Regions:
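Conserved glycine-rich cofactor-binding loop
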Residues: 14-15
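Substrate-binding pocket helix/loop in short-chain dehydrogenase/reductase
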Residues: 92-93, 100-102
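Active-site helix of classical SDR
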Residues: 116, 152
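Residue(s) in the substrate-gating loop at a strand-loop-helix junction
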Residues: 136
Length: 234
């Protein structure tokens, strides 16, 4: 697709991979909307990247049902969903609570589904569209303390395949990107560790570059899934 002038929504676009992707898309000429729950953070990020801010909670159905028509109206159309909003909690199985499971799945599974559903309704009507789900290498291989997060990303991979099977007949590309560890505030908050500078680890911009490459394929071609690993993490 031609990214210049594409109309794009990035969920969870105020920080981390979402912000880096929104910035890269805007620099490539796309018209970008970002959404998040924190008004101040979303408005600040949108101002810095030249995008349009929307305050929305992807796990709240009414919020999402309102969001997509607002994006379509504001951008003058809608071509691409970067389904990026995510949440993580990490704990040993014996310490994992029902609230941990609900909180992670409400954003990573329910939220992703609600935004994809409302976006798909618009894309089907226009017989074109793109959905990129931002998953994780944790969705391909479980790890200690990852019961809530890894299971949600395994679920997202299944959802990606279901949606692709349903939507490709409408000329809608459903794709998934699986980042390995990325130096973002999300990663540090989720694991309760201090932010460090490590040039061997991935940055949000590395994932943004991969997403741009996936979208830039001719519309007749679809990169169904891409996994991005650090070459030699220390």
């Amino acid at each position: 697709m031609n990214i210049a002038n594409a109309r794009v929504l990035v969920t969870g676009g105020s920080s981390g991979i979402g912000r880096a992707t929104a910035l890269a898309l805007a620099e490539a000429g796309a018209r970008v909307a970002i959404c998040g729950r924190n008004r101040a953070a979303v408005e600040q990020a949108a101002g810095e990247i030249g995008g349009t801010p929307f305050v929305a909670d992807v796990s709240d159905e009414a919020s999402v049902v309102k969001l997509i028509p607002d994006v379509v109206r504001t951008l003058g159309g809608y071509d691409v969903l970067i389904n990026n909003a995510g949440f993580g909690r990490f704990a040993p199985l014996i310490d994992t609570t029902a609230d941990d499971m609900r909180a992670v799945w409400e954003t990573n599974v329910l939220g992703a589904t609600l935004v994809a559903r409302e976006s798909a309704r618009h894309f089907i009507a226009q017989s074109s569209g793109n959905i990129i789900n931002v998953s994780s290498t944790s969705g391909a291989r479980g790890s200690a303390n990852g019961s809530a997060y890894s299971s949600s990303k395994f679920a997202l991979t299944s959802l990606t395949e279901c949606w692709r099977a349903e939507l490709r007949k409408h000329n809608i590309r459903v794709m998934q990107i699986n980042p390995s560890e990325v130096l973002t505030d999300f990663a540090y908050r989720a694991r309760g560790t201090e932010r460090v500078t490590d040039p061997s680890k991935l940055l949000g911009s590395d994932i943004a570059d991969a997403i741009i490459a996936m979208l830039a394929q001719n519309d007749r071609a679809m990169v169904t899934e891409m996994t991005v690993w650090a070459t030699n993490p220390q």
